[in-house]
């Protein structure tokens, strides 16, 4: 079955929360103590934070669909990354996850292309991305879209501080 991409709506809150939690667990679940991970997921990926994000006119989320099932997503919104060059109106790619069973089929590039079309309408906007310092595949992927490293910051889950690179496409 071919995978489809569509924009998320408020009706997708629960499905978005479910895929956000599932993909974060699949990708990073072994990286944090269980209670700290659960607290983080509830604070950031449960239904209410998703509802708030979807209600924000500066945010946009795309869903990767296999029939009626969400198998991936990309979320963007107002930039919150800590960098002195960040400006009002800049956009941050906040989350970009696809279930492992659906990776390496070109679907990530399709999601990114849909996002980039939105990002640059009606005019080109600056893109910011935070990526883990050891996620070399993601760094190469974002470089193909014109992003380069401009800084670093700590991404915090519980008591764990992960070094993240700040990437920017001017």
Identify the meaning behind each predicted range.
Residues 3, 7-13, 17-32, 38-101, ...:
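Acetyl-CoA-dependent GNAT
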Residues 62, 87-91, 125-139, 143-170:
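C-terminal "cap" of GNAT-fold acetyltransferases
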Residues 99-101, 105, 133-134:
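Active-site acidic-Proline motif in GNAT/NAT acetyltransferases
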